[in-house]
From Swiss-Prot:
Swiss-Prot/TrEMBL keywords: Isomerase, Magnesium, Metal-binding
Record's function text: Catalyzes the epimerization of D-Ala-D-Ala to D-Ala-L-Ala. Has broad substrate specificity and catalyzes the epimerization of a variety of dipeptides containing an N-terminal Ala followed by Ser, Thr, Val, Met, His, Phe or Trp (in vitro).
A Gene Ontology BP annotation from the UniProt entry: peptide metabolic process
SUPFAM superfamilies: Enolase C-terminal domain-like, Enolase N-terminal domain-like
Protein's recorded name: L-Ala-D/L-amino acid epimerase
Native organism: Flavobacterium johnsoniae (strain ATCC 17061 / DSM 2064 / JCM 8514 / BCRC 14874 / CCUG 350202 / NBRC 14942 / NCIMB 11054 / UW101) (Cytophaga johnsonae)
């Protein structure tokens, strides 16, 4: 098996702002694994919040190149378990590698990934489209630029309720709110009341990740469901979220790929938690991998490639929130 690493700098359509940062370009690592005439592709993007850079990921993968290239024809579970000890401090690199291996494995088997997992896709949820923090006029213009059935609105400002009130005047779409750890306990509970009146479906990670007492209080008193994001990073976190959140948002780059992400979703479902997968600002390589988990999800946020000025791959397509699969096997990706 041959490992190929590529670095890209993805240009965004608009400056993207959340409560922590603003970006115009998104650095991205694409991993390709070649074997027996097949190629599998995976992706992970840089993330300043987690101190992840593309050169760092490449360096971590280069260190174990021989181990990766000598591990072939194992199931993705066995492959992940073998590689995890070497990359346990770089889950982003592990994710890109795991996505590529799952893609390659399914292509060798002659199946789409969701077919290999025996999933049926008739009830797949629609993806939301993210509106980053900006002036209200800019946020309204972003909505008008792309009419969509569900919007995820990034908040964490002093005018959050006013922003949502103003946006609501311009659309009947479902709203989801992501405060990116920007609120306190009372603020979250009070905001939930106001936001429910404004047609908000749920709140995502309103408070700091480690505020477990606060999460429990909000869980009891919020009139809207609350979904964990930063509080649910790796497999061990799912059980902690029980009785503290109504659901979990799994990010593949944070947990180490599709292999552990799939297990996290299965555990969440057993615990009666709502399930969601979220994306980063990334290309169709990463987004196409997420698509194969859709049959297991209540919600999904996989609009990352829609935020790009120019994509670097083809794969799944998204129109008006509805995800359509590529005709190709594996995750269905082709690099442009």
């Amino acid at each position: 098996m041959k490992l190929i690493l590529r670095e890209y700098n993805l240009k965004l359509k608009h400056t993207f702002t959340i409560s922590r940062e603003s970006i115009d370009f998104q650095p991205s690592l694409i991993v390709e694994l070649q074997s027996e005439g097949f190629s599998g592709f995976g992706e992970a993007t840089s993330n300043p919040y987690y101190n992840i850079t593309v050169p760092m990921m490449m360096q971590d993968l280069e260190k174990i190149r021989s181990i990766i290239e000598d591990t072939e024809n194992e199931t993705p579970d066995v492959f992940w378990a073998k590689i995890h000890p070497y990359l346990k401090n770089d889950m982003f690199a592990l994710c890109a590698l795991d996505l590529a291996y799952n893609d390659l494995y399914a292509r060798k088997k002659g199946k789409k990934l969701y077919e290999l997992w025996n999933y049926t896709t008739e009830r797949n949820p629609m993806t939301d489209y993210t509106i980053g923090i900006a002036s209200i006029d800019k946020m309204v213009s972003k909505m008008q630029e792309l009419p969509w059935p569900i919007y995820k609105i990034k908040l964490g400002t002093k005018e959050d309720i006013e922003i949502v009130k103003e946006l609501r005047k311009h659309t009947n779409a479902v709203f989801r709110i992501d405060a990116n750890c920007g609120w306190g306990v009372e603020e979250t509970i009070n905001n939930s009341v106001e936001l429910k009146k404004l047609g908000v479906e749920f709140l995502e990670q309103p408070m700091k990740a480690d505020n477990w007492e606060g999460h429990k209080e909000v869980f009891k008193h919020s009139v809207l469901p609350v979904i964990a994001d930063e509080s649910c990073i790796i497999e061990e976190d799912v059980a902690k979220c029980f009785n503290h959140f109504h659901g979990v948002n799994v990010k593949l780059v944070k947990c180490g790929g599709l292999t552990p992400g799939k297990r996290m979703i299965e555990e969440a479902k057993k615990l009666g938690l709502r399930t969601m997968v979220g994306c980063m600002t990334e290309s169709t390589v990463g987004i196409s991998a997420i698509a194969h988990l859709l049959p297991q999800l209540d919600y999904v946020d996989m609009d990352g490639a829609l935020l790009l000025a120019e994509d670097i791959a083809t794969g799944v397509t998204i129109k008006d929130g509805v995800v359509s699969y590529s005709n190709l096997n594996g995750t269905g990706v082709t690099l442009l």
